[in-house]
C-alpha cells in the first residue's frame, strides 16, 4: 500500500491502497513526502488535496515491495481513496498490475466500494496517523476477503486517463474537437489569408478557430501566449505555424493544456503569476462569458485566488500551485458510484433497437401514439364526428328540397358548411371561459379524461374548422349558387320565387341584401382577426417595415379579437334573414350561440365586478436586470389559489381595457401576492416605465436596479387591478411524489411559487397560524411531493437576482434535501472550454470559502451552458425506479419538443414514467 500525505494532520489526503489477492500477504505501508498541494504551510483545512495523475505512473514498478515480496504474477487491485477527518470515500476500484482499468465485473466493483467505505469509516483511533493506518489495514483485510470469493479478472495496462485527476481536465479543454476539427480550421485559414499573402493576422485568429466575436479578446490572448511559447514574432503566422498552434491547443493531455493556460496568464514569461495577471485573465474570461458582475469584481476574486495559493504573501504563485488547484475534483463525483451500474444498464436499454419488419415498426409507433395522446384523440374524434354529422344532416336535408333542382349539390355543400360554422362559432368560446375551466379542473375529476391543458390549442383547432366552414359556405354560394340562380330559365327558377321574389339579374342584388353584406363584413373582420392572431404577427416574427410593425404584435391581436363582438352580432342577424328558411324555430343560429355567449359574457362581467370589489395595494416594487418588473401587492380577502396558477393584471395608467396573464410567484401560504413581469411588448414596456418613475436606487443590502417599498410612505403607485386565479398545468404538481420543474428565463415564475409552497409545507407546524388558517386547504392537505428537481435556464447573469432571496431561503431551510436546485447560465461557455476554466476555478473557491456562487450570487452553485436533458432524465430515472414523475415546463416553445420526446422515450423504455406538462403563454 502506498499513500501520499500533506504536511498537516488536518489535510485531506488521497491514497492508493493495494491488496494482493491472497490472504497470506502481509500489510505494509510507507509514507512519502511528495510535494504539497499549496505553496507554504498547509495548516488550514480548506479542501481535499487530490492526487496528481502523474504520481500513479510508477506504481506498477514498485508492486513487489508493496506486496511484501510477492512475484510479478500476482494480481493487484488499485483503490483510490479520499480520506477526510471523519470519513473515507472510494473514488474507483481498478486492476493495477501492469495496467489499469475499472473492474470488468461492475457488481464486484460496487460490492468492493461499499465494503471499503463501511470498513474504513467504522475504524477509529487516537491519532490521525494511527487512524489512517488502521483504516487502511482493516480495508485491506476486507478487500482480500471479498476477492477471495471470485476469480480475478484479466490484467490490463494502467491507463493514466482513468484516474481521478481526469475529472479536473474538464476545466482545461480548449476547443471541442467534435465541432472544430483541423480540416475546418484549414479551410478558414485559406479564406482569411487570401488577401494577406498567405498569412493569418492575429486579429482574425478567433475567426479561424471557429470562435464567436465575443471571444475575440480571449483568442487574441491565446494567440499571444502561443506565439511567445513558439518564439513567433509579429502579428501574422503561416499555415505551418497555425498547425503547430492547433496541435498545442487541441492536445488532450493535462500537461499540455495546463501549460497553454499558464502561458496565457504569465505574460511576462518569468514563470510566476502575479495578482494583476490573475485579475486580468479573470476579467477576460468574464467578458467572454458575458458575466459582467464577475468582470467588475475581478480584482477581488484575484485576491481570493492569491489568498488561497499564496498564504505566505510572496506576491506570486507558481504553476505547481495552479496545477493542484485545478486538480480539485467535485465531491459529488466521489459519491456517484452507487448508481453507476444501474446507469450503465439504463444506457444500454435506451439505445434504439432497429426493427427490421416495417409493419412491426409502424404498429409500435401507432400504439405509442395512441397511449400518449388518447385524451386528445377522443376529443378530436368527437369534434370531427359532430362536425361531420351536422354537415351530412344538412346536406341530405337540402338534397330533398326544391332548391336542389335549381342549385344542385352547391346548395347542399353551402348549407352543410353553414351548419358546422354555427356549431364551431358557439364552441370556440368555451375554451376561453377561464373561470369555468378552472372550476372544472379544481372541483371535478374531468381532468383525467379531458385535456384542459390543451384548451388554447383546441381553441385554435376550432378556428381552423371555422375557416373551413366559411370557405364551404361562402365559396359555394358565390361561385355556384348565385350564378345558377341568375342564369336559370323561368321554368327552372319558378320554385325559388317564393324565397327570392323576382329572379335576380346580377351579383349586386345578392350583395346589397342583408344576407349579402352581413356575410361579407363578417368574412372581412374574421380574416383580419385570424391573420393578426397567427404567431408570425402576434409575436412579431416577420421582418416588416416599421410602419407596418405598429399594426402587429400583441396589442393588434388583443384589439382585433374584440371585433368578434361585431361578428357575433352580425351572425345572429345573418341567421335570422335567411332566404330559404322562413319558420322561426328552423332558424337555429341563435340556438347554437345563446348559451356560449351568455357564459362568456358572464365571465367578462365577473372579471370587471371581481376586480373592482377586491382592490389591491402595492407593497413593494422592484426593477431587476433583464428588464423584469416585480410587483408585490396585498392579497384580497378570499383570494385562494394554487401554486402554478396565474392571474390577469390590468393597469389603467397603461391601458384601461387590456388584461394580461402572469404566473403568480408567491406561494398560497404567503400573506401577499407577487408577479414578475418581463418587458417583451408595448404594454409591459409602458408598465415598467410608469412604475420605474416612483422607484429609486436600492439601499445597501437590497437587490434590484430600482426599488420602492410601500412602507416608505404614501408613494403614488399606479392603480393595479387583478382577476383570478386561473388554472394552469403546473398546478397539478401535487399529484406527484417526484417532480421535475423546468423554467426557461422568465418561465421560472410558476416554478418559484411551487418551490415556495414546498418550503412552506416543509415548515409544517412552524408556520404562522393566521397563514395556516387562511390557506389550510391549499397546503398540507393532499400534499404528496417528496422530491423536486428544479432546473432554471437563463441567458443572463443578472437574471439570478430575480429570485435570489428565494434561492437562499431554500438552501437554508431544505435540510432534508427535498429540493434540488440547478441554475444554468447559457451565456457561459460549456464546461471544458478554456474561456470558462478560470471561472470554474473561481466558482469552486468562492463557494467553498463563503458558500456563495460567483455567477448567481446565491448559495446555489450555477452550471455553465445548457443542461444535457437526456442525462437529467437518466439521473431521475436511476434514482426513482418505478415512480411516476411530473415534468412541468414553462418557457419559450423551442425546448418543448426535446423535453416531451425524452419524457416519452424514458417512459416507454424504463420503469420510471414521466408525465410532461407545458405552460402556454
UniProtKB/Swiss-Prot annotation:
Disruption phenotype: Plants do not accumulate reactive oxygen species during disease-resistance reactions, do not up-regulate UV-B-dependent gene expression and are impaired in abscisic acid-induced stomatal closing and in root growth and seed germination inhibitions. It is a multi-pass membrane protein. GO terms for biological process: carbohydrate homeostasis; cellular response to hypoxia; defense response to fungus; negative regulation of programmed cell death; osmosensory signaling pathway; reactive oxygen species metabolic process; response to heat; response to wounding. It is an enzyme of class 1 (oxidoreductase). Its main location: membrane. It is found in: Membrane. The modification Phosphoserine is found at residues 8-9, 26, 39, 339, 343, 347. Ca(2+) binds at residues 266, 268, 270, 272, 277. Residues 1-376, 483-516, 581-588, 756-921 are cytoplasmic. Signal peptide: none annotated. PANTHER family: NADPH OXIDASE (PTHR11972), RESPIRATORY BURST OXIDASE HOMOLOG PROTEIN D (PTHR11972:SF197). This is Respiratory burst oxidase homolog protein D. The lineage of its organism: Eukaryota, Viridiplantae, Streptophyta, Embryophyta, Tracheophyta. The gene is RBOHD.
Amino acid at each position: 500500500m502506498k499513500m501520499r500525505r500533506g504536511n498537516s494532520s488536518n489535510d485531506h489526503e488521497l491514497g492508493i491502497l493495494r491488496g494482493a489477492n491472497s490472504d497470506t500477504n502481509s500489510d505494509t505501508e510507507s509514507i512519502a513526502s511528495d510535494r504539497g498541494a499549496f505553496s507554504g504551510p498547509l495548516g488550514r483545512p480548506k479542501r481535499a488535496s487530490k492526487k496528481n495523475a502523474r504520481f500513479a505512473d510508477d506504481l506498477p514498478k514498485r508492486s513487489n515491495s508493496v506486496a511484501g515480496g510477492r512475484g510479478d504474477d500476482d494480481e493487484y487491485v488499485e483503490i483510490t481513496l479520499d480520506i477526510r477527518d471523519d470519513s473515507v470515500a472510494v473514488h474507483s476500484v481498478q486492476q493495477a498490475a501492469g495496467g489499469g482499468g475499472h473492474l470488468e465485473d461492475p457488481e464486484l466493483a460496487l460490492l468492493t466500494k461499499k465494503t471499503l467505505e463501511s470498513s474504513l469509516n467504522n475504524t477509529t483511533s487516537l491519532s490521525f496517523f494511527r487512524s489512517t493506518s488502521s483504516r487502511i489495514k482493516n480495508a485491506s483485510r476486507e478487500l482480500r476477503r471479498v476477492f477471495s470469493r471470485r476469480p480475478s479478472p484479466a490484467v490490463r495496462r494502467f491507463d493514466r486517463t482513468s484516474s481521478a485527476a481526469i475529472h479536473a481536465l474538464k476545466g482545461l479543454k480548449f476547443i471541442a474537437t467534435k465541432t472544430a476539427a483541423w480540416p475546418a480550421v484549414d479551410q478558414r485559414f485559406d479564406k482569411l489569408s487570401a488577401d494577406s499573402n498567405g498569412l493569418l493576422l492575429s486579429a482574425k485568429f478567433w475567426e479561424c478557430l471557429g470562435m464567436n466575436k465575443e471571444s475575440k479578446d480571449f483568442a487574441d490572448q491565446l494567440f499571444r501566449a502561443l506565439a511567445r511559447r513558439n518564439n513567433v514574432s509579429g502579428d501574422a503566422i503561416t499555415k505551418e505555424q497555425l498547425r503547430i498552434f492547433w496541435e498545442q491547443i487541441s492536445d488532450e493531455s493535462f500537461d499540455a493544456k495546463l501549460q497553454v493556460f499558464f502561458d496565457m496568464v504569465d505574460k511576462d514569461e518569468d514563470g510566476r503569476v502575479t495578482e494583476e495577471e490573475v485579475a486580468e485573465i479573470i476579467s477576460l474570461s468574464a467578458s467572454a462569458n458575458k458575466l459582467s458582475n464577475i468582470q467588475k469584481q475581478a480584482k477581488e476574486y484575484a485576491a481570493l485566488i492569491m489568498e488561497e495559493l499564496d498564504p505566505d504573501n510572496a506576491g506570486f504563485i507558481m504553476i505547481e500551485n495552479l496545477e493542484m488547484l485545478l486538480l480539485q475534483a467535485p465531491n459529488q463525483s466521489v459519491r456517484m458510484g452507487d448508481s453507476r451500474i444501474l446507469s450503465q444498464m439504463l444506457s444500454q436499454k435506451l439505445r434504439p433497437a432497429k426493427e427490421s419488419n416495417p409493419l412491426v415498426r409502424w404498429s409500435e409507433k401507432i400504439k405509442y401514439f395512441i397511449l400518449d395522446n388518447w385524451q386528445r384523440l377522443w376529443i378530436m374524434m368527437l369534434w370531427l364526428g359532430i362536425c361531420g354529422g351536422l354537415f351530412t344532416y344538412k346536406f341530405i336535408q337540402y338534397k330533398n328540397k326544391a332548391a336542389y333542382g335549381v342549385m344542385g349539390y352547391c346548395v347542399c355543400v353551402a348549407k352543410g358548411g353553414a351548419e358546422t360554422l354555427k356549431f364551431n362559432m358557439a364552441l370556440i368560446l368555451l375554451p376561453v371561459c377561464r373561470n369555468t375551466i378552472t372550476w372544472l379542473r379544481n372541483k371535478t375529476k374531468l381532468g383525467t379524461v379531458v385535456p384542459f391543458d390543451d384548451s388554447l390549442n383546441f381553441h385554435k383547432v376550432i378556428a381552423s374548422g371555422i375557416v373551413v366552414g366559411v370557405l364551404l359556405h361562402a365559396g359555394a354560394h358565390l361561385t355556384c349558387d348565385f350564378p345558377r340562380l341568375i342564369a336559370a330559365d323561368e321554368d327552372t327558377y319558378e320554385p325559388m320565387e317564393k324565397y327570392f321574389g323576382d329572379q335576380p339579374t346580377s351579383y349586386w342584388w345578392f350583395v346589397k341584401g342583408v344576407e349579402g353584406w352581413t356575410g361579407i363584413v363578417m368574412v372581412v373582420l374574421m380574416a383580419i382577426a385570424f391573420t393578426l392572431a397567427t404567431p408570425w404577427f402576434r409575436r412579431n416574427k416577420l421582418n416588416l417595415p416599421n410602419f407596418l410593425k405598429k399594426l402587429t404584435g400583441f396589442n393588434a391581436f388583443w384589439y382585433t379579437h374584440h371585433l368578434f363582438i361585431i361578428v357575433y352580432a352580425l351572425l345572429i342577424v345573418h341567421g335570422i334573414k335567411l332566404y330559404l328558411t322562413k319558420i322561426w324555430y328552423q332558424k337555429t343560429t341563435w340556438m347554437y350561440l345563446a348559451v356560449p355567449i351568455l357564459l362568456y359574457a358572464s365571465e367578462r362581467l365577473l372579471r370587471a365586478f371581481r376586480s373592482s370589489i377586491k382592490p389591491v395595494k402595492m407593497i413593494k416594487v422592484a426593477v431587476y436586470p433583464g428588464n423584469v418588473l416585480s410587483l408585490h401587492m396585498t392579497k384580497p380577502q378570499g383570494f385562494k389559489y394554487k401554486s402554478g396558477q396565474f392571474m390577469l393584471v390590468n393597469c389603467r395608467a397603461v391601458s384601461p381595457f387590456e388584461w394580461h396573464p402572469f404566473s403568480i410567484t408567491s406561494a398560497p401560504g404567503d400573506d401577499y401576492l407577487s408577479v414578475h413581469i418581463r418587458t417583451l411588448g408595448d404594454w409591459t414596456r409602458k408598465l415598467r416605465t410608469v412604475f420605474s418613475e416612483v422607484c429609486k436606487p436600492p439601499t445597501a443590502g437590497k437587490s434590484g436596479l430600482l426599488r420602492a417599498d410601500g412602507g416608505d410612505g404614501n408613494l403614488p403607485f399606479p392603480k393595479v387591478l387583478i382577476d383570478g386565479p386561473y388554472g394552469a398545468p403546473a398546478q397539478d404538481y401535487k399529484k406527484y411524489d417526484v417532480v421535475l420543474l423546468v423554467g426557461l428565463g422568465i418561465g421560472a415564475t410558476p416554478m418559484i411559487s411551487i418551490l415556495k409552497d414546498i418550503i412552506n409545507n416543509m415548515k409544517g407546524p412552524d408556520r404562522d397560524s393566521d397563514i395556516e388558517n387562511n390557506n389550510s386547504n391549499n397546503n398540507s392537505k393532499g400534499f404528496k411531493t417528496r422530491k423536486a428537481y428544479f432546473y432554471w435556464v437563463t441567458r443572463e447573469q443578472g437574471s439570478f437576482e430575480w429570485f435570489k432571496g428565494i434561492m437562499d431561503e431554500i438552501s437554508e431551510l431544505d435540510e432534508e434535501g427535498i429540493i434540488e436546485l440547478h441554475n444554468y447560465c447559457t451565456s457561459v461557455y460549456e464546461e471544458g472550454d478554456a474561456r470558462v476554466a478560470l471561472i470554474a476555478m473561481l466558482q469552486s473557491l468562492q463557494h467553498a470559502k463563503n458558500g456563495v456562487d460567483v455567477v448567481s450570487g446565491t448559495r446555489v452553485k450555477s452550471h455553465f451552458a445548457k443542461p444535457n436533458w437526456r442525462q437529467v432524465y437518466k439521473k431521475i430515472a436511476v434514482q426513482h425506479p418505478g415512480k411516476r414523475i411530473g415534468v412541468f415546463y414553462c418557457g419559450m416553445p423551442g425546448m418543448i419538443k426535446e423535453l416531451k420526446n425524452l419524457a416519452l422515450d424514458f417512459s416507454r423504455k424504463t420503469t420510471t414514467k414521466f408525465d410532461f406538462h407545458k405552460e402556454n403563454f
